């Protein structure tokens, strides 16, 4: 049965709300219309494309998971997070991150990415850096992508401490490493 445009758009909205990862191709098959019709309907309804919907769901999920700071306080983009276990973030090195004379990334950006990831991985409302032992192992240049991987290596809730090790990579090459001794509240 062919639906009119208004009915189809209402059902389209409901379907995408229920299953945000559905493709335009699947929607076209479900509603018996062309992919172009689905795209036009999405545009009229201001529904983003699949890639954008996936990103929105991921950000919402991370916003709900990260307890110790808000996502806009994280340096880089968190792409994986398991509280009190491990986390991964990506930082694209842009012009604002580098020295203008040589296009080498300023060290505090690499430290900030690693430190904010160490804070974000803590399963507690309060997480602060007590101390850090860090090493920069090679220069990072504008245009490179830094992937920071944090791993919780020790949790002492009764002492209010957690140790997080962070290694940052460009490709397979390590560019930064750090051991962060984190303070957390004792009643988490």
Swiss-Prot record:
GO molecular function: DNA binding; DNA-binding transcription factor activity
Pfam families per record: 4HBT
Signal peptide: none
Keyword terms, alphabetized: DNA-binding, Fatty acid biosynthesis, Fatty acid metabolism, Lipid biosynthesis, Lipid metabolism, Repressor, Transcription, Transcription regulation
Presence of the UniProt keyword Metal-binding in the record: no
Entry's induction text: Autoregulated.
GO terms of biological process kind: fatty acid biosynthetic process; negative regulation of DNA-templated transcription; negative regulation of fatty acid biosynthetic process
InterPro entries in the cross-refs: HotDog_dom_sf, Thioestr_dom, Transcription_factor_FapR, WH-like_DNA-bd_sf
CDD domains: hot_dog
NCBIfam families listed in its UniProt record: PRK04424.1
Function text: Transcription factor involved in regulation of membrane lipid biosynthesis by repressing genes involved in fatty acid and phospholipid metabolism. Binds to the 5'-TTAGTANNNNNTANTAA-3' consensus sequence found in the promoter of fabHAF operon (containing fabHA and fabF genes), yhdO and fapR genes and prevents their expression. Its action is probably modulated by malonyl-CoA.
HAMAP family named in the record: Transcrip_fact_FapR
Sequence similarity: Belongs to the FapR family.
Name of this protein: Transcription factor FapR
Source organism: Bacillus subtilis (strain 168)
